[in-house]
Curated annotation (Swiss-Prot):
Nuclear export signal, short sequence motif: residues: 125-134
Protein's name according to its UniProt entry: Dapper homolog 1
Biological process according to GO: dendrite morphogenesis; embryonic hindgut morphogenesis; embryonic morphogenesis; gastrulation with mouth forming second; negative regulation of canonical Wnt signaling pathway; negative regulation of G1/S transition of mitotic cell cycle; negative regulation of JNK cascade; negative regulation of transcription by RNA polymerase II
Source taxon at top rank: Eukaryota
Region (Required for self-association): 85-149
Oligomer and partners: Can form homodimers and heterodimers with DACT2 or DACT3. Interacts with CSNK1D, PKA catalytic subunit, PKC-type kinase, CSNK2A1, CSNK2B, DVL1, DLV2, DVAL3, VANGL1, VANGL2, CTNND1 and HDAC1. Interacts with GSK3B; the interaction is indicative for an association of DACT1 with the beta-catenin destruction complex. Interacts with GSK3A. Interacts with YWHAB; the interaction is enhanced by PKA phosphorylating DACT1 at Ser-769. Interacts with CTNNB1.
Function: Involved in regulation of intracellular signaling pathways during development. Specifically thought to play a role in canonical and/or non-canonical Wnt signaling pathways through interaction with DSH (Dishevelled) family proteins. The activation/inhibition of Wnt signaling may depend on the phosphorylation status. Proposed to regulate the degradation of CTNNB1/beta-catenin, thereby modulating the transcriptional activation of target genes of the Wnt signaling pathway. Its function in stabilizing CTNNB1 may involve inhibition of GSK3B activity. Promotes the membrane localization of CTNNB1.
A Gene Ontology term for the protein's cellular component: glutamatergic synapse
Feature: compositional bias, Basic residues: 564-574
Amino acid sequence: MKPDAAREPEPLSPGRGAEAEGRWRERGEADTERQRTRERQEATLAGLAELGYLRQRQELLVRGALRCSGTVGTVAPRSGELRGDAAQRSRLEEKFLEENILLLRRQLNCLRRRDAGLLNQLQELDKQISDLRLDVEKTSEEHLETDSRPSSGFYELSDGASGSLSNSSNSVFSECLSSCHSSTCFCSPLEAALTISDGCPKSADVNPKYQCDLVSKNGNDVYRYPSPLHAVAVQSPMFLLCLTGNTLREEEGLGSHASDICIGSELNATKTDNSLPSPSSLWSASHPASSKKMDGYILSLVQKKTHPVRTNKPRTSVNADPTKGLLRNGSVCVRAPSGVPPGSSVNFKNTKQMCLPAGGITSLENGPFSPPKQRSKDSKTDQLESKRLALPESCSAGAAMEPQSKHVPKAAKAASQELTRCQAGLGESMKESNQASAVSPKTSPGRGPVAPAESKALQLPKKMSQKNSLQAVPALDRPALDFKSEGSSQSLEEGHLVKAQFIPGQQAAARPHRAHRNPGVARSATLKARGQAAMEHGLPTVREKPRAAGKKCRFPDDSDTNKKFRKTSAKGRRSGGLQDAGLPGRALGTGGHRAGSRAHAHGREPVVAKPKHKRTDYRRWKSSAEVSYEEALRRARRARREHGAAYRVAVALPYASPYAYVPSDSEYSAECESLFHSTVVDTSEDEQSNYTTNCFGDSESSVSEGDFVGESTTTSDSEESGGLIWSQFVQTLPIQTVTAPDLHTRPTKTFVKIKASHNLKKKILRFRSGSLKLMTTV
């Protein structure tokens, strides 16, 4: 030590020249190497002292146990004498240990004072060396690496030239006893022993750096202080010292505070030599830090592994979650008004989706919302699809409305999405309130519920000019419209924007009348096709014609456009059919306009399907949907049997959309149902194909899903069509109310044969080869 003290003041004298810098570098490297060696020796000494302490403690424990076993058979006076001797002996040992410790502390203090001058010089050397390395050798990374290493540095692999603060200055003022022992003041073997009374290690390594637990760098292993493994691990750089305070600052390499820390630790050592914490208290004090590190590490790993929730992506997998069921089969088109960023271009499809005059949205706002909102959205998507291809002329109004609706804020979307979740309860109460208004038309079986729908349908064109300016605001009030999935925005939101003929206000009122359908109305299913063609070709004029509520309304071009519309229906329905697959109610519309002789067809708005050569948006159904096909088939047979036997309209049970609210066993049947419709609609133009359509799609949901049974598109159809009604069809078709007991009086028949046309079989095979067997033979 003394040669160091004599030699190290010299580096301060040389000048600033190149030779001085070279000398500084050489001497600095030598000093840092010396400090590393010294640090290693101190760590080794601390480990040896710890092992010695452990040995002595074990020896004392063994002796105590032997004494206890020896005194078992002796008499009480003898045991009392032994206890007195043991107590006196322990007091002597404690006194001896305390004297040794005090002597060692005095020697340490002397060494610290002697080294106080060296600290400043070493710090200067470190600074100069680091500057030289940065300027000349450009090895700042190595410098940082050496700084981050544990200061014990027993197995450090750094080269001798890397002089870092943690390697030099920290080791100088570390509170270990190596300097004491180098001064030839080695004490008796008990110097490292502990005071027996408090079990506190008062060994040579007073430095808490060597008295606390060691944690491996990966955080998996902890070596508690008084243990042989700790004594070995303290010499290895592979472990981190669980310390706060001085040692952490040393590890960070804050050499500027080295002298202050040294003096503070010296004072602490002199003041607290008799009050050092026990190993257990040291562990408890250091354990929170290590546990915090471990918790943070685990949390970071968990956060890395956690996948973000993808709520906005449409999924093709079968899912019972209501929002995912809605988002899964949405169109690629994005509805601009619902808060889509203005940067997204509005394509031709969007323009057609915007063709709804503001009245449609107005009626939506005013109309009550009820649980089948998801179903209404999907059925509206059907209508939307048909209009994409067949209604370019009606896009002028929607195109004019588009710029306004583009400014709907995204917050509106989020708020409305929250409202959607709250509507389950709200919709039920609103549904009850609307049942009162919907029950009154029961008395007039011919045209009862049609009048409100017609009146609203007639008001829509007039409201167009008034509501254009309000289109951005209602987005907040339309929870059913605003799901954030761009991929499904068409099926969720734009469905409401299809045409003014949709009357959403009736959607809740419609449910009580699901069964109030005229059996004869089913025969007028072809009217739906004609009516839809009329809506596509003569929409502006028909829309504004007030019709009497009690009359059947026929469109002027009914007979002319019927065939034409059936052909074109193949175009718009295909994509709508597959996008409908998300919800049970959607599939009904396709079969509706072709089910001329089926009383159970649901009078849903007729939607056309694409021809085969234009169908490009097929989606493959996952194998789990085969169960849904089977269910749909079963229900179709059941409904077919009922309708074939009695040829009357079944009363649908209270609506419960399996996707939106109850994850029932039929939750995927809607997907296969819409699949059937989309495949069946354009199979052929004969009645056999019509028959198959009804069997697979409409009747299935009419019985099992609590869907609407009956072809008429009356007020009760507003629910199944997603809360929107074709006003022309409202005027066109009458209804006859059928009392609810019909459903219960008529037994449910579950085993029925189903005929499928050859074209239908081909189309079903195209989707799922395994499901054809189910559909035709089960």
